[in-house]
Design a protein with these regions (language model features):
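AMP-binding/adenylate-forming
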Residues: 1-31, 47, 72
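Short hydrophobic/charged patches on amphipathic alpha-helices used for structural packing
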Residues: 7-11, 39, 197
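Conserved AMP-binding/adenylate-forming
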Residues: 15, 46-51, 55-72, 79-174, ...
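Short acidic/polar active-site loop segments enriched in Thr and Asp
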Residues: 20, 46, 69, 207, ...
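Conserved helix-loop-beta element of the AMP-binding
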Residues: 20-24, 37-58
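AMP-binding/adenylate-forming catalytic core of the ANL superfamily
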Residues: 22, 133, 138-139, 157, ...
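Glycine-centered tight turns that cap/initiate beta-strands
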Residues: 44, 68, 104, 205-208, ...
């Protein structure tokens, strides 16, 4: 999806080559919704796999409604040979979950502190997602990168630390709860940015939303969000904040600020690059602090 113009022609390419399935990140599916399908025959397309980042529920439902194609959410990392879990093609599909572990892929959720596995989590308890099995790589080429990447359980089994937070439900399905490093910690209260992003994506004018923590002298950090709007939209940032305030389930998670930006910073594979958004928030807070103190400086 890095080729310029590919997205604009993707419907045609899928129809021409009679594609049975495709795999992409959520931002690709969100963008496809704004590209007319025209007369392309997509009856060949049976399944669309999605991973790499949480799929906003509104985008999920709208894509299936518009295309009639079933979306299957899954999970994987390069270190785990791309896919480790997936919602079943035939069987119960749980929207919002990353499905069931694939055959031979071992996934576990555990409490990890200082690169030490404290204990495995109970059903429904959130912890760090660990993986092992023949699909998991043995280690990085540069041994220094292995520091903190592995934990060992009481039986001497070695697990790769994904850095993602997750939980198992009663049926054995996995549910992501964000990246450990993406959690917004407001005065000791952990806030999952996904709960903010999903509510903002319910607004008809919002294409993409990303929530991050901005520095705060009192609480350490507070939630804010960046959004990309549909072409021609005139909705204001304050109107979006009011919209979120009425829908975000936790009062502490309501974003204190929303900024409208022309496009999201992306990684090479199409994932929203949150470190850049956090940098933008830090730069703005620093500028405002310096200006309030009457200090002339450039950030």
């Amino acid at each position: 999806f890095r080729t310029p113009g590919l997205l604009q022609n993707l419907w045609g390419l899928l129809a021409r080559h009679r594609a049975y399935a495709m795999m992409a990140v959520p931002t690709v599916y969100a963008s496809l919704l704004d590209i007319p399908r025209g007369e392309h025959d997509l009856s060949c397309l049976r399944h669309c796999l999605v991973g790499a980042a949480p799929m906003p529920l509104e985008v999920f439902n709208r894509f299936e409604r518009v295309t009639g194609v079933k979306l299957l959410e899954g999970y994987g990392m390069t270190e785990g040979t791309a896919v480790s879990s997936l919602n079943p093609v035939a069987g119960q599909r749980k929207v919002g979950s990353i499905g069931l572990p694939l055959p031979y892929a071992e996934l576990a959720v555990a409490l990890v502190e200082d690169a030490t596995l404290q204990r495995f989590c109970e059903t429904g308890e959130i912890g760090v997602l660990l993986m092992r099995g023949p699909n998991v790589f043995p280690g990085y080429m540069d041994p220094s990168h292995d520091s903190g990447a592995w934990v060992v359980d009481a039986n001497g089994r070695r697990w790769f630390n994904s850095g993602d937070l997750a939980r198992f439900d009663d049926d054995g399905y996995l549910w992501l709860a964000g990246r450990a490093k993406d959690l917004i910690i407001r005065g000791g209260h952990n806030i999952d940015p996904q709960m903010i992003e999903e509510r903002l994506c319910e607004h008809p004018d919002v294409v993409l939303a990303a929530a991050v923590g901005q520095p705060d002298a009192h609480a350490g950090e507070v939630p804010m969000a960046y959004v990309v709007l549909r072409d021609g939209s005139t909705v204001s940032a304050e109107a979006l904040r009011e919209f979120a305030a009425g829908r975000v389930p936790e009062r502490a998670a309501v974003p204190v600020r929303i900024e409208i930006i022309p496009q999201m910073p992306m990684t090479a594979v199409g994932k929203i690059f949150k470190p850049r958004l956090r940098d933008l928030a830090i730069e703005r807070v620093c500028r405002e602090t310096l200006q309030a103190a009457g200090i002339e400086a450039t950030i």
